[in-house]
Structure formats: C-alpha cells, structure tokens
C-alpha cells in the first residue's frame, strides 16, 4: 500500500487539508505505515548529512519529504469507507470501493460524475489480486464503465495455477531442520508476512512436520500490521 499512499503526508506538508477517502482497512494500515515511512526518511536524511559532514562536503542539507508529525496529523483527515457503499464526496461526484483482492484494504474505485445533466462512470482498477488467496477475498467484478484507468504491471503475463506454497515450505523446513539449522525468511511487513504466518499455522495445525518448532516475527511494523489484519478479517 505504501507505493499508493506514501506521499499523502507530503500533500499535508504542502498545505492540503481536505478529506482522504480510503477503505477502513487501508486507513488502519496507514496509521502505522506512514509513520514508518517518515521514520525511515528522517533516519536516512540524518545519515546522509553526517556522511557529507565527515567528508567535509558543502552539500545542500538532506531533508525528508515529511516527518512523523505530518504522518500523524494527516491521519485526522482520513475517512474510512466500507466496500460496496456509495459515498457522495462532492456535488455531482460519487464513489464506491470494490474489493480488489490484492492486499487487505485494496480496492478498485467506481466514480460517478454528473455535470449539466450528463452522467459518466469512471473506474480506476488499482492493483488487482489473484483468486483463491489465503487471507483476502477474491476481486469483485465490475460490469460497466464509460472510462477505465487500469493498473497493468503484469497485464502481459499468463498466470498458471496457484502454487502449493504450504508444500514448498514443508520441504524447506524439513530439509533445514534435518541439518540442524534454522529457517530465516525475509518478507514484506504488510501482506506477505501475514500470508506466511497463515501457511505456517496450517503446517503446525495439520502436523505436516513431525516436530514442533517456534516461530519468531522480528519486525515491529509487521507485528502492528498483523494486529490490523486480525482486526479487519476476524
């Protein structure tokens, strides 16, 4: 989600004080992701400035796009919306969020525009997920639009069947445990980590490995995101 929402605090820094409409789950995730983004920027700017000072270079000071205060303040402008509800955001403009099945909170957006008695419907697809994913629902279907703005990063690919992720994980776990090792899995904090936790739980519940093992998630952001997943899918 951060590639879609990460610059919203910069709008706030530049004076934007309007409402930000998003699905409720996306709004929840933004409360932690935007602060994390600000923290990373502030840390990197500080590191670059220290490095430039040590090199005795008179470069322009590195400044983050926004700080944590801006990330917190802009959240007050968020309006959480539910899937399927038609919302009038201004005279002659209505929107509806449809589950895109990509990540928790992801959505395609239907926009109805009416002016001088003429009505048009515009659809922005957003990132569209695949079907039969373990946590999020399948993408919703749209039946009509006058104009479509479509995300198409993988539009030229032919997708086969869904891989058996649990089977592959079991192979890796068994091979590593048999050698006396530990399994370390780097993963995106939002989305992928939660899917991995789901797969690992299924492995343990169904006793697909003939030994018990502990699971540690070493990421404050992933822990906060997981709690938001639990809140929104339970």
Where do the model's predicted regions map?
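Short, surface-exposed, charge-dense and proline/glycine-enriched linear segments
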Residues: 50-58, 214-223
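His/Asp/Glu-rich metal-coordinating catalytic cores
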Residues: 1-5, 11-195, 201-208
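Short edge beta-strand segments in beta-sheet-rich domains
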Residues: 210-212
